[in-house]
């Protein structure tokens, strides 16, 4: 199937007189998690990961570029048809840089402009100046044209959230955004990203699995707020009278008219708009800056934080019940598979008040599968073995909050290697959880601090240490992150971010320990900063015990022991009232027993 599609695309490239096609893992809204009908990278390659780039050469091999999360997965899924470029390995280049090194002749690279940002477009093009390579804009999408039996587009009517969940009305949010537009001299603002539109409208949807968003565009003017969606007549106008709702397909015609009639600047975020939208407007009429919704959404208000805290308690209670049942089953020597565990966890999650959906498909990787960072569908054939560990990464969408938690558990008596490595990863987690930092600190600095103990042992992990998370929105949210990749956004109070160091060894397994945290201002107990800056820290939101069988107590410092015992004490106090059955309460009490005792 994939081979035939690749050949069909190559034939179309020949007809278009193009040398290559670039297929990115995005769509017209730059989604990370895609609806089925927009998974073009998967349709052309078979790769099911959430991030990657395909380059199909009209003559020669097909190429797939993936980061370290997907090295193993990409080889397993696509290695027979694609040359897999494992980013992060020595001598391996990103897709656009690899293209830049093909210097026998200038190349025409075809791309769908509605899947690439202006920032990407310009960065790639500037890197090709010496070779003369250039973009070729496609009318339509080349993959769509060869994708037989493409899934139907799912679009549902959005639903409104009250201020008891959002903490602020859409009218108030629009007022603040318009003030920032005035300050920056913008007549209009165009929004493409679905979580930004959902946040600004105080609407949610179910057009993408596990992401409570609806497919839409938005245009904000000083006297109008227009939303282009699939159900403009569904009754949301009565709930949001400050907005005008039009059919989704009217968007392109509207911005074309806006481009002709506007006399002022139109604000387009170069990292959150597609080149398809950007090319509608003359350069002289475009204000290219990060749009004002990005930071407003990232820094949660008190209501959003309270709702997130409640969501985490519900998720923690469900996860504790599941872990208790897992331990009971393993001790009884009853058969259990990865799929059994994932199904049990979803059952427990869905029983919690306010549950809406999982926040992403559960990762339950046993043994060597734990080394696949974004392991796919848990297998009903992979049985849980007593000598192995189980890595579980899961979360929920709960009314008002989004969770994401990873725990790695021993399924029997752990080996010395498992305990050594688990304890090292736990120490990295504690290091970040305890870290104090001045305002203005970027995530790259905290990333290095978190990894330092692992580095001293010759250990590391290929993914970032932390990603932002939304408030009943996407489980991956920008711009905040804790990563080696430098980013120009400092961590600010109210941001929610993950703390998830790890270790992975192909053929052996993986360890990851993840809690979500909120960035907060530290009010007392610290010296005055010489620059007058506030001191910030992270407050943990998730409370699920760490596996004490895997912890080498004597390897922990007194400060680390105190942090861990305090964390487990808080875990017990917060969850004991949510666990009605004695067997779960007894399991929790045992799991939270202080190591210093």
Residue ranges and their predicted role:
Residues 1-597:
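Active-site neighborhoods and metal-handling regions in enzymes and metal-associated proteins
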